[in-house]
């Protein structure tokens, strides 16, 4: 499904929160949306690896990496696995790598920046807890919509206006 965040903001101004404009679009999908699943981790993508291995149909994985610009929380292998398992997209408050391959993957991916160094795998992090960055709190079970204009969050699913 194609989402246009300005149209959603115009149609649902009382429902949406707009994430501060700090993310770049790296994925093969220009727009994506779905139910939020969250991970809170810092320079350790063990939980990201576990989650992309699950059924993600209709879901967006929001990864709060603490804004770290020192390690990549997502690379081509995890992005390809997420796409195979039906994830709509990922928003990474941190870095990703292998961006040329990710750009060809049928997956929405927004992140702060790129970094070539992978993370450690210590199994540290939290799954499905509220996370806050960009002026918005992302709660599991709420909805996220993203495109080249930005990222918005809603407590309920939104329909594109006709």
Swiss-Prot record:
Disulfide feature: none
One Gene Ontology MF term: metal ion binding
One annotated GO biological process: regulation of RNA metabolic process
Catalytic activity: 4-hydroxy-4-methyl-2-oxoglutarate = 2 pyruvate; oxaloacetate + H(+) = pyruvate + CO2
Lyase recorded as keyword: yes
E.C. number(s) listed in UniProt: 4.1.3.17, 4.1.1.112
Superkingdom of source: Bacteria
Residues reported in the UniProt entry to bind substrate: 75-78, 97
Entry-linked PANTHER family: 4-HYDROXY-4-METHYL-2-OXOGLUTARATE ALDOLASE 3-RELATED (PTHR33254), REGULATOR OF RIBONUCLEASE ACTIVITY A (PTHR33254:SF29)
Role noted for this protein: Catalyzes the aldol cleavage of 4-hydroxy-4-methyl-2-oxoglutarate (HMG) into 2 molecules of pyruvate. Also contains a secondary oxaloacetate (OAA) decarboxylase activity due to the common pyruvate enolate transition state formed following C-C bond cleavage in the retro-aldol and decarboxylation reactions.
Assembly, per entry: Homotrimer.
Protein family per UniProt: Belongs to the class II aldolase/RraA-like family.
Protein name: Putative 4-hydroxy-4-methyl-2-oxoglutarate aldolase
Species, as recorded: Azotobacter vinelandii (strain DJ / ATCC BAA-1303)
Lineage: Bacteria, Pseudomonadati, Pseudomonadota, Gammaproteobacteria, Pseudomonadales
